[in-house]
Curated annotation (Swiss-Prot):
Residues annotated with Omega-N-methylarginine modification: 336
Gene giving rise to this polypeptide: TP53
DNA-binding segment(s): 105-295
Chain intervals for the UniProt region annotation (Interaction with USP7): 362-366
Keyword Endoplasmic reticulum: yes
Region (Interaction with E4F1): 259-297
Disease with which this protein is associated in UniProt: p53 is found in increased amounts in a wide variety of transformed cells. p53 is frequently mutated or inactivated in many types of cancer.
Crosslink feature (Glycyl lysine isopeptide (Lys-Gly) (interchain with G-Cter in ubiquitin)) location: 24, 294-295, 354, 360
Subcellular location as annotated: Cytoplasm; Nucleus; Nucleus, PML body; Endoplasmic reticulum
Name of the protein described by the UniProt record: Cellular tumor antigen p53
CDD domains: P53
Region described as Interaction with AXIN1: spans on this chain: 119-295
UniProt family annotation: Belongs to the p53 family.
């Protein structure tokens, strides 16, 4: 019985299947190393793992796998130490600003104020300004000319800064920035950082600044005096995100603050206006102006579930009659001079007397007509009775 076992121990290392199984018993850190020499193979066959495998191949393979598992973290090979992909941490929210800039109008010593071009509300318009709302309606990445008017020329080195803030009080501490979708699109960025909302078009001296304390974005350009034949300076701004973008403004109204500053950053003038970036500026301007005229204030946007069409109160198709003006109201009239006062007093008394006589005459005529109607009814009934009496004997 011992001879077959000895023969088996000699024949097993020479077979290909046995060699492949033994190759799997090697530690992971030696898989990519050079092939072992004949001496190392002899040592391998004399090891305890090989002896156990010869007795019971299944248990030996399980034991070798269990032994190789704790040794894997200690291996220094970069292939064996490749970590599993870790889920990316959620993006941290944008920090809130420590201060809210003022947006109150301040003309200063130089009479600083803003102006806009006159434009209609057609569908083809890309930028339009509403004076009654003090609101600019524009399309995404379209030119928005803003005029700067001053009563006297500012000192050399004066700069113009544009900054956007949220209009509503509960959002004022948040920094206005583009949505993630528009941040990833590098179209039209140029020198501007991708998260900046306001850009300046056609000015190579524009500086895009991020305040380290307030975290707010602004764009600064040097002030240029008006050209010959012009009374104002025009700066062309672009807004690079829609007001309805999720993750950005998210339908929250914003204000653009334009400030005039000296080289040291001191304020020389300030003005602001509301901005809405939308697909159809003309239509939105007409809608908001109508709501403003009806209610005296901008109509708040209704949530999607409550946006129902209001039914008219009067469903009848007949036109309503016009209400007559009432003459029972009293008015006070200031008259200079006593003579004029007496003249108007006599005129007023005469008109009052005329109205009283007309009222009395209408009452008398109404009573007389009712009396005639009653008399006429009585005479008709008497005539019928007489005719019946006269016809009575003839019928008999």
């Amino acid at each position: 019985m011992e001879e077959p076992q000895s023969d088996l121990s000699i024949e097993l290392p020479l077979s290909q299947e046995t060699f492949s199984d033994l190759w799997k018993l090697l530690p992971p850190n030696n898989v990519l190393s050079t092939l072992p020499s004949s001496d190392s193979i002899e040592e391998l066959f004399l090891s305890e793992n090989v002896a156990g495998w010869l007795e019971d191949p299944g248990e030996a393979l399980q034991g070798s796998a269990a032994a190789a598992a704790p040794a894997a973290p200690a291996a220094e090979d970069p292939v064996a130490e490749t970590p599993a992909p870790v889920a990316s941490a959620p993006a941290t929210p944008w920090p809130l600003s420590s201060s809210v800039p003022s947006y109150k109008t301040y003309q200063g010593d130089y009479g600083f104020r803003l102006g806009f071009l006159h434009s209609g509300t057609a569908k083809s318009v890309t930028c339009t300004y509403s004076p009654s709302l003090n609101k600019l309606f524009c399309q995404l990445a379209k030119t928005c000319p803003v005029q700067l008017w001053v009563s006297s020329t500012p000192p050399p080195g004066t700069r113009v800064r544009a900054m956007a803030i949220y209009k509503k009080l509960q959002y004022m501490t948040e920094v206005v920035r583009r949505c993630p979708h528009h941040e990833r699109s590098s179209e039209g960025d140029g020198l501007a950082p991708p998260q900046h909302l306001i850009r300046v078009e056609g000015n190579m001296h524009a500086e895009y600044l991020d305040d380290k304390q307030t975290f707010r974005h602004s764009v600064v350009v040097p002030y240029e005096p008006p050209e010959v034949g012009s009374d104002c300076t025009t700066i062309h701004y672009n807004y690079m995100c829609n007001s309805s973008c999720m993750g950005g403004m998210n339908r929250r109204p914003i204000l653009t603050i334009i400030t005039l500053e000296d080289p040291s950053g001191n304020l020389l003038g300030r003005n602001s206006f509301e901005v809405r970036i939308c697909a159809c500026p003309g239509r939105d301007r007409r809608t908001e102006e109508k709501n403003f005229q009806k209610k005296g204030e901008p109509c708040p946007e209704l949530p999607p579930k409550s946006a129902k069409r209001a039914l008219p109160t009067n469903t009848s198709s007949s036109p309503q009659p016009k209400r007559k003006t009432l003459d029972g109201e009293y008015f006070t009239l200031k008259i200079r001079g006593q003579e004029r006062f007496k003249m108007f007093q006599e005129l007023n008394e005469a008109l009052e007397l005329k109205d009283a006589q007309a009222l009395k005459a209408s009452e008398d005529s109404g009573a007389h007509s009712s009396y005639l109607k009653s008399k006429k009814g009585q005479s008709a009934s008497r005539l019928k009775k007489l005719m019946i009496k006269r016809e009575g004997p003839d019928s008999d």
